[in-house]
Amino acid sequence: MPEFTYEIVETLGTLSETAKGWTKELNLISWNDRPAKYDVRDWAPEHAKMGKGCTLSPDEVILLRDLLNEIDL
């Protein structure tokens, strides 16, 4: 697996937490020194490990927001 680097630029919020302390978070993350993108992903306590996630550009976040606003909850 290729090596990569990341920096959590800003923590925007926690969506959920498991009994083992893993959290699903929305963060602004810079991957491999590139401009930061929005990222939803599971994190172990202290961000020691990460699970699979979904990275979104600002334009994709706007579209997602619009789609979510159309849902009748």
Predicted regions located by residue number:
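Positively charged, low-complexity terminal tracts
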Residues: 1-73
